[in-house]
Amino acid sequence: MTSTAAEPGSAERWGPLWGARADDWARTEDQQVPTYEEAIRRVGIEPGQRVLDVGCGSGVFLRLAADRGAKPFGVYASEALVAVARSRAPEADVRVAEMERLPYADDTFDLVTGFNSFFFAADMVAALREAGRVAKPGAPVVTQVWGRPENCTFEAMKRVVRRFMPAPPPDAPPPPELWRSARGDGGRHTSL
């Protein structure tokens, strides 16, 4: 599937869902800190590096990057969570944007991350290519997705939470599609 200007992007499709309970989502993101720390340990963040978090949520990773002296940037689908991220990491440049059409020049970032975000793209291949496009040559692109349902404790939580949330778009892709997309896009990706 290829995105066109007429098709809704990820922000338009998912922003209302994630923005509906922004403070609740923000509280749950703290559970991701061990994953974020492991990503930082593996790829490193140096002072002055430009770091982009695609799907930055409430800005926890942006805060960790800023604490290490990086210049953090983030994009997200929901204005409500962008506001939370801006308050958590005021030095970060955080904006609502489509991950399939990132508002940055080629070769801008020393590190691009996407924690549990790329599989929400309206066009995952386009989103992954965009991550590669804005990464400097040789810069890592770190992705994280949920595990296979049979190995993922998050699946149980999703079943409960699903009862209280609006339904996702009917054509939302399953997480395994991300891996097929990542293998075929020719980009530079580091997966956790």
Listing of model-derived features with the role each one plays in the protein:
Residues 2-49, 60-64, 80-84, 88, ...:
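Conserved class I S-adenosyl-L-methionine
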Residues 100-111:
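A short acidic, Gly/Pro-enriched loop at the edge of an enzyme's catalytic core
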Residues 111-125, 147:
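A short SAM/SAH-binding and catalytic strip from SAM-dependent methyltransferases
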